[in-house]
């Protein structure tokens, strides 16, 4: 996955081929498997930003998060329906079943307070929409975010969730092209 126009990739993070591992060290209570995958991918991108020193961001209050996931918390919603029908549900499952939890968990765990959005659509269809939103949040005269974690989440054939996070920042301005010929002097005369 590449950066949208006007943006640069500052870091990448992803779950491993067997699903999330790193995120399970964060105390979050009952969570949907998609939440674990997103939390893991965002944590990996943050670690890359910090040079492997652990998740850190200077000012998370202006960091936006966009997650694209077709399923979101569907697994927990289905489990909640089954448990409710049998009379043995846990109130914690209601929190874990909210689709916004997929985005909100990473925001809470890592202190990210910029704009956030969950696009419930297949990643291949949602990526262009998410990329355009990230570009708009990062650009213009009054940017809404200093960085955007753009996360694509999907279910692997083995059943676990995989997520990839691109940590996007505004692209640096183009360097000014020198129009002056280095073989000419300031006054336009040929140098010897």
Features from the language model and the residues they span:
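Conserved "HGTGT" condensation-loop signature of ketosynthase/thiolase-family condensing enzymes
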Residues: 1-192
